[in-house]
A protein has these predicted regions:
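Mature, structured domains of secreted/extracytosolic soluble proteins
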Residues: 2-7, 21-192
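C-terminal motif of bacterial Sec signal peptides marking the signal peptidase cleavage site
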Residues: 16-19
């Protein structure tokens, strides 16, 4: 797995964001100077995905997973990356013991695969996603950093992501701009 793919995975895993809202829905979470707030923590558009994620009280599990997977340097790189960042509550929905098992050194490759499944190369905004979905007749395929596909669709004004196993996640906060990409917060963990 090359460094760009690992970086993408790290961003996705660390932020674990799922489900994108349209730009109208996300506007309440952004100040006039471009600073967004995730879990009450300021996310500065001049900082990297990792530099911002470590301050989010809602993404402690993701940050720990990105660290365990060895993806910090990748997601701190120039990118750009689109990270779908699951919250701590999203990780808590997984079966008991899953996170504890995944962060063990012997499961690093599996963890990297899951995290990079949450990363799409390039900067894909909520507006880009909704346009892709509209142009695709209600669905859009996104190729992730691990090479697998996510399917994006809309439910009202909320972007939904469907993983390879049929699991769904909603984007609960979209367009959290970073110096090396964009984060969209998710309410469920996606599985390749």
């Amino acid at each position: 797995m090359n460094k760009n793919l690992i970086t993408s995975a790290l961003l996705a895993g660390s932020l674990a964001l799922g489900g994108c809202m349209t730009s109208t829905a996300m506007s309440d979470d952004m100040s006039a100077n471009g600073v967004s707030y995730v879990g009450g923590a300021a996310m500065y558009p001049t900082k990297t995905i990792v530099a911002n994620a470590v301050n989010s009280p809602d993404h402690k599990t993701l940050v720990a997973a990105v660290t365990a997977a060895g993806l910090v340097d990748t997601l701190s790189g120039t990118g750009p990356f689109t990270v779908f960042a699951p919250t701590d509550a999203a990780f808590a929905k997984l079966p008991a013991g899953t996170v504890e098992t995944l962060v063990k050194p012997e499961n690093k490759t599996t963890l990297q695969s899951i995290l990079t499944y949450h990363v799409v190369p390039g900067r894909v905004t909520a507006s880009d996603l909704t346009t892709m979905i509209r142009d695709g007749g209600g669905r859009a395929s996104l190729t992730t950093a691990n090479g697998a596909t996510l399917t994006a669709s809309m439910m009202g004004d909320v972007v939904m992501l469907t993983d390879a196993k049929g699991g769904m996640s909603h984007v609960t906060q979209a367009d959290v701009m970073q110096s090396n990409g964009v984060i969209h917060v998710l309410d469920s963990v996606l599985m390749p």
